[in-house]
Amino acid sequence: MSCAAPLPSTAMAATVMITGANSGIGLEFATQYATKGWTVIATHRRAEPPKSLTDLASRFNKVRIESLDVTNVEQVRGLATKLSDVPIDVLINNAGVYNDRSKCAGDDEACPGDWTVESFGNLKYPLLDTILAVNVKGPLIVSECFYKNVQASTLKKIVAISSSNGSLTGKSGPPPGAIFYRLSKAALNREMQLVAEATRKDGVTVVMLNPGPTLTERQEYLHGYAGMLKTSFTVENMIKTIDKVTIMDTGRFLRYDGVTEPW
């Protein structure tokens, strides 16, 4: 499948594209990169641009807001065509689904959602389809459709935001259960390993990052729990790790601070 025409190699200021950039880790990535002077392509899947991103764009004139449902192949192709002349130095696959948010208001980013439907004996399988579509299918579609943009850039990096819950040896994580979320992150890791193998020849670096137990809007109910990390801290460290990785690191699964995570 070819999602966009080949690009000329053009020297430009560094550009990052972030999926799911309207809240949590994605919004923090957008904010910190914008603060550094990068051009930021911040995507969201809402009908209208969310206030979080319009506020950011009002502060930084190099923030570009785009609507994108990462599970919709035609929509991703359409945006790739629209941005076909834009080299993307760092492509961050951040959009993700963690649990059942069917009872949350569409714009309520603080709603924690429901983990109980991901416990064995109480599994709700339509949710599995949603989680796999966003967490596994989405990053693959986005990485392929925007590959020429990455290839045409100076830095040539693809990042997938994963989780220690994708580790086959890991035992820590969200409340008991979360079967769908855990298996989606394991699949994401293997998927990105394969992407790394396929793109190494082009000098593209692909890594998976575990942000750790991050206190985003949806985890505010965990405020005060030992070990929870501020979003600003994890993102600051992930950016440092992204800066440091090279083609020698492609295919690796790393913690936010660059430490190797177990598969």
Describe each region flagged by the PLM.
Residues 101, 167-171, 209-222:
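Short beta-loop-alpha junction of Rossmann-like oxidoreductase domains
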Residues 22, 26-31:
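N-terminal Rossmann NAD(P)H-binding glycine-rich loop of SDR-like oxidoreductase domains
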Residues 18-19, 93-94, 157-163, 205-210:
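Structural signature of the Rossmann-like NAD(P)-dependent dehydrogenase/reductase core
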Residues 71-87:
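Conserved Rossmann-fold cofactor-binding substructure of NAD(P)-dependent oxidoreductases
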Residues 57-74:
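Rossmann-fold cofactor-recognition segment
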Residues 201, 208, 216, 220-263:
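C-terminal helical subdomain
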Residues 36-51:
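Conserved glycine-rich Rossmann-like NAD(P)H-binding loop of the short-chain dehydrogenase/reductase
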Residues 97-132, 137-141, 147-200:
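Catalytic loop of short-chain dehydrogenase/reductase
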